[in-house]
Regions:
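Mid-domain alpha/beta scaffold segments of enzyme catalytic cores
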Residues: 1-199
Length: 199
């Protein structure tokens, strides 16, 4: 399970995305042995007061260095929710941490693929950028794959987009729902060469 919000996922079975209350420090949290986590400032949180956002960024710096954190994100852009200008300000920090700690970037993207494509071209990252919960059409999937993005597929997905994505570039996730059973039965899911061994 490449990306889930279920904190009770069995240790080692998933990359668990830590929620706002844990990242902010409002809720005490002790990572489980052998568990794997991702941390990031979600674009929906971009409407929070500036002081809270500053605190989140400080906490992100601390969490990103931890061994049990194997990915940054989810982060990214959402044209329908949150403060776009703040989302633009938050994104570079995630890229820097992803590169500094050699951890992939898990991306939330709603109606902003043009921006992500431009940013990938600008940064030329060495780490994988993975679009989570991808449900776009084949034309968009091809465009993203050609730009070197990975795609992660969840409960709702475009079957043709999934089929055209090379096994080494696709992932499956439950997000806030369930793992897609049809994809679980597909034997071609592989660990990408060179991908973080903990992922």
């Amino acid at each position: 399970d490449f990306h889930t919000h279920h904190l009770d996922a069995p240790a080692g079975s998933a990359i668990v995305n830590l929620p706002l209350e844990i990242l902010s420090g409002a809720t005490p949290f002790a990572p489980l042995p052998d568990a794997r986590y991702s941390v990031g400032v979600h674009p929906w949180w971009s409407s929070l007061p500036p002081a809270e956002l500053a605190q989140l960024q400080q906490q992100l710096l601390l969490w990103a260095a931890r061994d049990e954190v194997v990915a940054l994100g989810e982060c990214g852009f959402d044209r329908l929710r949150g403060d776009w200008a703040v989302q633009e300000q938050l994104f570079p920090l995630h890229v820097r941490l992803s590169e500094a700690y050699s951890k992939p970037l898990i991306l939330h993207c709603v109606r902003a693929f043009d921006r992500l494509l431009a940013l990938r071209k600008h940064y030329r990252p060495t780490q994988r950028w993975v679009i989570h919960g991808f449900r776009g059409r084949p034309a968009l999937a091809r465009q993203l794959l050609q730009a070197d993005f990975d795609l992660s597929f969840g409960e709702h997905y475009n079957a043709e987009s999934y089929a055209l994505t090379p096994p080494s570039r696709r992932h499956i996730e439950s997000d806030e729902g369930r793992l897609p059973i049809a994809l679980l039965s597909t034997p071609t899911i592989e660990r990408p060469e060179g991908f973080n061994e903990k992922v």
